[in-house]
């Protein structure tokens, strides 16, 4: 059974390990767990869970499964206690997370598939080798560790109206919601999932845990097919609503945090900000906290994310124009775009298009723009 005393005990125990992360005031407050040790909130639950293991459990070594962040938390916690650790990671986990996990002292087993496949492999190895399993979210001590964020928020943000929390398996939001609602039932707790991995949303909709057949999202940290049993029960009781955000919205939020707040967030960590940016949760006129749950994004992925975020916000436009394939037409198009104040970065000619006109081509122009209104103005100018 979860008790608030466990959360205070976890906070005391974790004071030796974790940092109390900063609050940055913006139109909303940002709880920057991306600045936490290992770059994610996951170190809280992992380290507290390991600290509560018996000597016998520690002697067997620990095993965990993870999309990446829990892995680093378990590796750090296990190494700090002198315990051997083995982590099962999805083969598609970002290279940065795989290497960081090894760097904290863990052995790594890469498993084809997604988080749920890594989970099954970890259970098999636990049964075969006798390891102690550290669940990434469906465990009372893990939830208590994550819930210390809720205790920090009560201390840091007075008169808080609502908190927006990324949701994968549900460990973070369960801990935060339990702590906040126990201390102040009037605080609203909203969860956010990627539309391509909305297992908790679906489960709450049908009033029972649902396992999705497939999941896919850039937010690898919350790419989970099925929520936990305990986390589902807590979310059902304490969470006010859970919404979804699209891939483009996540990318736009990552870009917003990077460009405006100078904060590097991974996809999962940016979902809370995306929900506020795109009006998925009712926050107007309220004091709201967005938990930026992690910042472990692979640099190669970040480049793609920035491009998608720029496109979503109208900072990059891809314009297709059908024109006669003759000298001077390209100059005309370029002149219109230049006059509108956009900067052309790439031009592609397609003479093999499906146009009914034989002597025509499709011109694809990629240009830097200011916003969506600017893109619309350029399109109108080209039509004229």
PLM segments and residue spans:
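PLP-dependent amino-acid enzyme catalytic core
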Residues: 1-384
């Amino acid at each position: 059974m979860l008790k608030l005393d466990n959360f205070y005990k976890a906070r005391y125990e974790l004071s030796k390990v974790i940092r109390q992360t900063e609050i940055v005031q913006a139109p909303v407050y940002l709880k920057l767990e991306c600045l936490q040790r290992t770059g994610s909130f996951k170190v809280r639950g992992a380290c507290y869970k390991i600290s509560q293991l018996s000597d016998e459990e520690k002697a067997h070594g620990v095993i965990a499964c993870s999309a990446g962040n829990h892995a680093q938390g378990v590796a750090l916690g296990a190494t700090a206690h002198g315990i051997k650790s083995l982590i099962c990671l999805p083969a598609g986990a970002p290279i940065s997370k795989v290497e960081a996990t090894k760097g904290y002292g863990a052995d790594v087993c890469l498993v084809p598939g997604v988080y749920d496949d890594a989970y099954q492999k970890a259970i098999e190895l636990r049964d075969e080798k006798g390891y102690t399993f550290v669940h990434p979210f469906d465990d009372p001590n893990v939830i208590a560790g994550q819930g210390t964020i809720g205790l920090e928020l009560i201390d840091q943000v007075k008169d808080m109206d609502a908190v927006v929390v990324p949701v994968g398996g549900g460990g973070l939001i369960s801990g935060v919601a339990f702590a906040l609602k126990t201390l102040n039932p009037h605080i609203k707790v909203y969860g956010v999932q990627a539309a391509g991995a909305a297992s908790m949303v679906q489960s709450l909709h049908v009033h029972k845990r649902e396992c999705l057949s497939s999941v896919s999202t850039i937010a690898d940290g919350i790419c989970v097919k099925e929520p936990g049993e305990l986390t589902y029960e807590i979310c059902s009781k304490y969470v006010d609503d859970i919404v979804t955000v699209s891939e483009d919205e996540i990318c736009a939020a990552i870009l917003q945090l990077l460009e405006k707040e100078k904060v590097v967030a991974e996809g999962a960590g940016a979902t809370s900000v995306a929900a506020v940016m795109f009006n998925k949760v009712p926050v107007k006129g309220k004091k709201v906290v967005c938990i930026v749950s992690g910042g472990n994004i692979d640099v190669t992925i970040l480049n793609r994310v920035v491009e998608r975020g720029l496109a979503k916000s109208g900072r990059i436009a891809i314009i297709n124009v059908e024109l006669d394939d003759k000298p001077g037409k390209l100059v005309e198009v370029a002149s219109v775009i230049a006059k509108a104040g956009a900067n052309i970065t790439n031009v592609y000619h397609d003479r093999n298009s499906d146009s009914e006109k034989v002597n025509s081509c499709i011109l694809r122009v990629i240009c830097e723009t200011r916003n969506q209104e600017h893109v619309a103005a350029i399109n109108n100018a080209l039509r004229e």
